[in-house]
């Protein structure tokens, strides 16, 4: 029997707000443990939460950027469960009246066909504290860091539209791009600002039944999500084929063993309305005000890059996948760099050098103005491509302009015809055998002679002009 998977994702995204969701404590989970706390996020008796306006606005922009419909009224509930990371015994979430419904992301499936992956709803909630497990002597202990307690989150709950690991990975890549564009979050699984749980079940291909699902956690990268989903599909298919029942429970992904392992029985605590946080009522005027703050989104930007700059669809999508890269590209265009030159050197040279140094494009010392000055020297044949790559590396380590670096290193390209003709005449006189080979029909001899001219010029000669002048002289010899 052939099986297909039914997959839904639950994605928690930490909003990059300065304070927590219901208090004024700094939203800096990485600080020294338990310094960013107050009676509200520790939930002392009598502490009254106050919803952060900044968090509401960031969450609303995120929802609108994903095509979701902000609801006129949403509310917080108490999601009840007992665990050391939640001292009050419940988490403030939006179980019944979420902030937004609908929306979705368009991807391309494994066969190159467009596919819409829908979002069921998006809600806000507070994060829980962080548990740190250590060994003291021979005794295992668990410590609790409340810096993260109360951090502002949104949870995106998808429809079960996913069928393959590819679907899940492409959805997450596109989601990450969309969220970064609206400026709501860094959205990094590696840094914990995006956390993903996958709900997976299998069924006979061609049927529409919904079978028992298994939740998978502990996936710390998009690649891990793909690997975990693939493993779980295989595991459940084998279970069903052998007549074994799939039991509702939660499993952990182990990236070292590339397998999932049972964690606990699946438990959903009761949710009851919270009386301490007022309803969130959004007027049509407020929603339109938020919509007006949306930036140009990736798909629209890619379309504009194709229409305005003549890029291919693939090039435009690649550039617009990251807002910093897209903005840097347009800054080069504003500096009068040709679009194709800007695209090629940005994607093949600068980004590679930035990654090699562990930097971010926004923080690199190679500003668009400095990089553009280098590329314009290349376009004017003042330097060759090899020299441009050398100068680019130096731009990371010094504050000099490309022009001064070129002068200091003496690598300005020689394009003067008279000077180059003198070099060519000398090389032809010193290499009569190669000249005879060329006249005898061996075209590769021209490449040898060009190399000799480049060597004689110390690598400074313009190779395009050398080829043109050398070929003309050789052909004139008959």
Swiss-Prot record:
It catalyses: L-glutamyl-tRNA(Gln) + L-glutamine + ATP + H2O = L-glutaminyl-tRNA(Gln) + L-glutamate + ADP + phosphate + H(+); L-aspartyl-tRNA(Asn) + L-glutamine + ATP + H2O = L-asparaginyl-tRNA(Asn) + L-glutamate + ADP + phosphate + 2 H(+). One of its GO terms (biological process) is glutaminyl-tRNAGln biosynthesis via transamidation. Its EC number is 6.3.5.-. Signal peptide: none annotated. One of its GO terms (molecular function) is ATP binding. Keywords: ATP-binding, Ligase, Nucleotide-binding, Protein biosynthesis. It holds the Pfam family GatB_Yqey. SUPFAM superfamilies: GatB/YqeY motif (SSF89095), Glutamine synthetase/guanido kinase (SSF55931). The keyword Protein biosynthesis applies. It is an enzyme of class 6 (ligase). It comes from the Bacteria. NCBIfam families: gatB, PRK05477.1-2, PRK05477.1-4. Allows the formation of correctly charged Asn-tRNA(Asn) or Gln-tRNA(Gln) through the transamidation of misacylated Asp-tRNA(Asn) or Glu-tRNA(Gln) in organisms which lack either or both of asparaginyl-tRNA or glutaminyl-tRNA synthetases. The reaction takes place in the presence of glutamine and ATP through an activated phospho-Asp-tRNA(Asn) or phospho-Glu-tRNA(Gln). Belongs to the GatB/GatE family. GatB subfamily. Heterotrimer of A, B and C subunits. This is Aspartyl/glutamyl-tRNA(Asn/Gln) amidotransferase subunit B 1.
